[in-house]
Design a protein with these regions (language model features):
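Active-site rim/adjacent substrate-binding subdomains
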Residues: 2, 53-55, 100
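Glycine-/proline-rich flexible loop or hinge segments
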Residues: 10-16, 49-53, 75-88
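Acidic carboxylate-rich catalytic motifs and surrounding loops in phosphoryl-/glycosyl-chemistry enzymes
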Residues: 41-52, 299-308
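Short glycine-centered helix-capping/turn motifs at secondary-structure transition points
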Residues: 33, 37-40, 62, 70, ...
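Short, glycine/charge-rich beta-strand/loop segments that flank catalytic centers
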Residues: 46-53, 114-120
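Charged, often glycine-rich, active-site loop that binds/positions anionic groups
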Residues: 48-72
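N-terminal low-complexity, Ser/Thr- and acidic-residue-enriched intrinsically disordered segments
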Residues: 1-50
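A general "terminal functional-core" signal
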Residues: 74-329
């Protein structure tokens, strides 16, 4: 039995047909965890969908109405890059509910993992890049509204920059400063983003991503690390370690939201980095070890993963749970 809870529903499945996004990966990760005896049935919690009040903490009423009524324009649907359906919208509402539940559990158990979520390309008023609702942002804003947390940090290790995250949590920004090195570290000299309505609840955003990849426009996070093509394990882990310590010297979050994307993998169809499966597990271990040493609860979502062999994506996501078990046991 795990010392923390996993959040999962069969209804996490995204009904998008033949698509590069492996919609079946969530179920396959759940099955692998049970078959390999990493987890048992009692470790899983079933989420409820987020309600519209929660969704509206992040998304505009006009956008939510379009999603509820199926009235997205053709351009809006094409920008989202997945075919709209009522069932698809319901799956995203459920993913947001799953991230809320995982965040709540993380405060109780030090860590919790949603076997889904991480839809970081969703903006307040539109979706992009396979993302309709920004589940992580909804979870953060819900916990802030409930006075469970004041501050949060997002650590996004998907191969693609979290453009939606950066915009949602944007503070008052000045010029980003590029620094020399193997990769480019851009730090925005700003306050972290404040909640709508002038509340003092703040969010600090970190993104490590391939520079020469989607999205073309990368709005500034609190810290962006622009990684070069085909970066391998050792250099990636060095940049991650450096970035975490820089961020945590500047900001003390009540909750760390970790987007554990599988797409920095060397054989990912939509990525251009060169991490190995072992290197990605070490990445997860590093994030968990840093958070544990500083007594920061961690909520995890799976984010992207498009390996040529779906089994590799499943292994990478499964290893995230294994790494959490090893660090937090």
């Amino acid at each position: 039995m795990l010392p923390f809870k996993l959040v999962y529903s069969d209804a996490y499945y995204l009904p998008i047909g033949n698509h590069v996004f492996p919609a079946e990966k969530y179920r396959r990760v759940r099955d692998r965890l049970i078959v390999s005896c990493v987890a048992d049935a009692a470790d899983f919690l079933e989420p409820e969908p987020a309600n519209d009040r929660d969704i509206l903490l992040v998304h505009t009423p006009e956008y939510v109405e379009k999603l509820r009524t199926g009235t997205l324009s053709l351009r809006e649907e094409m920008e989202m890059e997945i075919p709209y359906s009522r069932n698809l919208a319901e799956a995203f509402w459920l993913a947001a509910g799953g991230s809320i539940l995982a965040a709540q559990q993380a405060l109780a158990d030090r860590v919790s993992i949603s076997i889904g979520g991480g839809f970081h390309h969703a903006f307040p008023d539109h979706g992009e890049g396979f993302c309709m609702i920004h589940d992580v942002a909804v979870a953060i804003r819900r916990l802030q509204r409930d006075n469970k947390i004041q501050t949060a940090m997002t650590v996004d290790c998907d191969v693609h920059q979290g453009n939606g995250t950066a915009v949602i949590f944007a503070g008052k920004r000045s010029v980003s400063v590029p620094q020399a090195g193997v990769a480019g570290l851009r730090m925005s000299h700003t306050r972290p983003g404040r909640m709508r309505g002038g509340h003092s609840s703040e969010v600090f955003t970190i993104s490590l991503h391939q520079h020469n990849n989607y999205p073309l426009w990368k709005p500034p996070s609190s810290i962006d690390v622009d990684l070069p093509d085909r970066l391998e394990d050792e250099d990636y882990l060095a940049w991650l370690d450096k970035t975490l310590h820089i961020g945590l010297r500047q900001f003390k979050p009540d909750l760390l939201c970790y987007l554990a994307g599988a797409d920095p993998y060397k054989d990912d169809q939509l990525g251009g980095l060169a991490l190995t499966i072992d290197g990605l597990k070490k990445r997860d271990e590093l994030v968990f070890q840093v958070a544990r040493s500083r007594h920061i609860p961690v909520m995890v979502t799976l984010a992207g993963g498009y390996a040529q062999k779906v089994e590799d994506t499943v292994t990478i996501h499964t290893n995230t749970v294994v790494a959490a078990k090893e660090v937090f046991t």
